From Swiss-Prot:
HAMAP family: VMA21. It comes from Eremothecium gossypii (strain ATCC 10895 / CBS 109.51 / FGSC 9923 / NRRL Y-1056) (Yeast). One of its GO terms (cellular component) is ER to Golgi transport vesicle membrane. The gene is VMA21. A motif (Prevents secretion from ER) lies at residues 74-77. The chain crosses the membrane at residues 9-29, 42-62. GO terms for biological process: vacuolar proton-transporting V-type ATPase complex assembly. This is Vacuolar ATPase assembly integral membrane protein VMA21.
Amino acid sequence: MAVDVPTSVIVKLMFFTLAMVSFPVLTFFVSQQYTSNTLVNGGLAALAANVVLFAYVIMAFSEDVPQSDGKESKKQQ
């Protein structure tokens, strides 16, 4: 039972997966250049992960939902 998933959904998922892995790690190591406190570096990396997560949630809620024909809504009533 294969489901046709739009390519735009796959592209968004791959982008945010890559961002969720690379952005916090990059933030951690870049912030190490400015401070040697690993607690601050870890906190900034966690903040970067939350930024990516919130961006994904906002994009998911703003995504267009395909309109169905009226047949399903009549069945539910």
